[in-house]
């Protein structure tokens, strides 16, 4: 399964690449598909490519939901470990 996630642009390197913050990590991504990007913009990232700009509020909501899902998965794994 592939997942596209919101990321924040931290630095523009050139017309085709930028540095994005992904879960606290900085990674170079391809931004060739988008115009008029600025530092601080949020984009949807899929397999290393920024696909579209995203409103900051929507990006934050999505990131919060993903964090919640991660916590749920951790709790389920812990519960399965306790059942053994």
From Swiss-Prot:
Protein name per Swiss-Prot or TrEMBL: Hydrogenase maturation factor HypC
Pfam family, one: HupF_HypC
Gene symbol of the encoding locus: hypC
Source superkingdom: Bacteria
Function: Involved in the maturation of [NiFe] hydrogenases. Involved in the biosynthesis of the Fe(CN)(2)CO cofactor.
GO biological process: protein maturation
GO molecular function annotation: carbon dioxide binding; iron ion binding
Family annotation (Gene3D superfamilies): 2.30.30.140
Pathway stated in the Swiss-Prot or TrEMBL entry: Protein modification; [NiFe] hydrogenase maturation
Cited InterPro entries: Hydgase_assmbl_chp_CS, Hydrogenase_HupF/HypC
Family membership noted in the UniProt record: Belongs to the HupF/HypC family.
Lineage: Bacteria, Pseudomonadati, Pseudomonadota, Gammaproteobacteria, Pseudomonadales
């Amino acid at each position: 399964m592939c997942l596209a996630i919101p990321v924040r642009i931290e630095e523009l390197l050139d017309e085709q690449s930028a540095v994005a913050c992904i879960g606290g990590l900085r990674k170079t991504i391809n931004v060739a598909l988008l115009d008029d990007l600025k530092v601080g913009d949020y984009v949807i990232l899929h397999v290393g490519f920024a696909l579209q700009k995203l409103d900051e509020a929507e990006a934050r909501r999505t990131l919060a939901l993903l964090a919640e899902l991660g916590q749920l998965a951790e709790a389920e794994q812990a519960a399965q470990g306790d059942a053994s």
